[in-house]
């Protein structure tokens, strides 16, 4: 079980809502994945309309909603969007995203830290999307973020854990849950993140853009579960030379 702030989750796979062919495929894929926390961009939904094509199936599925501020270019815009979401959806949970560059969608660390501090002060449960920067993640933790969401690779790139070395440091020093977000393009990437000790992963493009999103949702579910199980079991260490799994000398002595 994973606890973040005031909620406990049995699934460590969080999902997004973008890039699906239609809302029915989205909802069915999310259900197949077992995800209990689903993020959605405020700019893509009519948050005042419970019958919205994206919002309605999520409410019906009974998942926890995590509105995000994707599209915000600075702290002021993100804080404004957060207040709208809280009023319309009745949740103080927020995935904080601030990326002023539309080409690479890199999170702005300065604006993110400033917005996070203010949103926490205003009572939000803040989960910030950020660079895999151990110093920044520690600062976000110190201002009161409920978790940190460092990127594995650029959003939608499917390149996996390009920032692995830094993710390992973040996981080692964090005192709040670490959710690897962005760049996870295959179930094996998700399993790798979980084996490292990440508390959860967030996946969107890899499921939504798959030939069979529903089957891919199930595949990610199993990958996250197996990766976490492997981490808890304790992975065998790596070495630079061979060690026989069966003693060879005893066999030779018996045949002499």
Curated annotation (Swiss-Prot):
List where in the cell it is found: Cytoplasm
Q: Which CDD domains match?
A: ThiG
Question: Catalyzes what?
Answer: [ThiS sulfur-carrier protein]-C-terminal-Gly-aminoethanethioate + 2-iminoacetate + 1-deoxy-D-xylulose 5-phosphate = [ThiS sulfur-carrier protein]-C-terminal Gly-Gly + 2-[(2R,5Z)-2-carboxy-4-methylthiazol-5(2H)-ylidene]ethyl phosphate + 2 H2O + H(+)
What is the disulfide pattern of this chain?
none
Kindly identify the residues recorded as the active site: 95
For the protein in the UniProt heading, the enzyme class is transferase
InterPro entries tied to this protein: Aldolase_TIM, Thiazole_synthase_ThiG, ThiG
Q: Which GO terms describe its biological process?
A: thiamine diphosphate biosynthetic process
A Pfam family annotated for this UniProt entry: ThiG
EC nos: 2.8.1.10
| A cellular component term, taken from the record's GO annotations | cytoplasm
Q: Where does 1-deoxy-D-xylulose 5-phosphate bind?
A: 156, 182-183, 204-205
One function term, GO molecular function aspect:
thiazole synthase activity
From the UniProt record, give the pathway where this protein acts.
Cofactor biosynthesis; thiamine diphosphate biosynthesis
Keyword list, A-Z: Cytoplasm, Schiff base, Thiamine biosynthesis, Transferase
Q: Which PANTHER family match?
A: THIAZOLE SYNTHASE (PTHR34266:SF2)
What this protein is reported to do is described as: Catalyzes the rearrangement of 1-deoxy-D-xylulose 5-phosphate (DXP) to produce the thiazole phosphate moiety of thiamine. Sulfur is provided by the thiocarboxylate moiety of the carrier protein ThiS. In vitro, sulfur can be provided by H(2)S.
Q: In which family does this protein belong, per the annotation?
A: Belongs to the ThiG family.
Query: What assembly does the database describe for this protein?
Result: Homotetramer. Forms heterodimers with either ThiH or ThiS.
Task: Write down what this protein is called.
Answer: Thiazole synthase
Q: Which organism is it from?
A: Photobacterium profundum (strain SS9)
Gene name on record?
thiG
């Amino acid at each position: 079980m994973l606890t973040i702030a005031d909620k406990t989750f049995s699934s460590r796979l969080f999902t997004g809502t973008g890039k699906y062919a239609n809302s029915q495929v989205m909802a069915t894929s999310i259900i197949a994945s077992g995800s209990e926390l689903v993020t959605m961009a405020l700019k893509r939904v009519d948050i005042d309309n419970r019958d919205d094509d994206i919002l309605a199936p999520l409410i019906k599925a009974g998942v926890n909603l995590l509105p995000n501020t994707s599209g915000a270019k600075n702290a002021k815009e993100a804080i404004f969007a957060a207040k709208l979401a809280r009023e319309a959806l009745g949740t103080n949970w927020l995935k904080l995203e601030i990326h002023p560059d539309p080409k690479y969608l890199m999170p702005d660390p300065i604006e993110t830290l400033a917005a996070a501090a203010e949103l926490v002060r205003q009572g939000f449960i803040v989960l910030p999307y950020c660079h895999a920067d151990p110093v920044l993640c520690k600062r976000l933790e110190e201002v009161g973020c409920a978790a940190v969401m460092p990127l594995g690779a650029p959003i939608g790139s499917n390149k996996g854990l390009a920032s692995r070395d830094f993710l390992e440091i973040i996981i080692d020093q964090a005192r709040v849950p670490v959710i690897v977000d962005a760049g996870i393009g295959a179930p094996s990437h998700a399993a790798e993140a979980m084996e490292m000790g990440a508390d959860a992963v967030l996946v969107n493009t890899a499921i939504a853009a798959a030939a069979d999103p529903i089957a891919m949702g199930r595949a990610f579910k199993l990958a996250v579960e197996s990766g976490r199980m492997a981490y808890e079991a304790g992975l065998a260490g790596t070495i630079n030379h061979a060690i026989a799994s069966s003693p060879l000398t005893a066999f030779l002595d018996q045949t002499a």
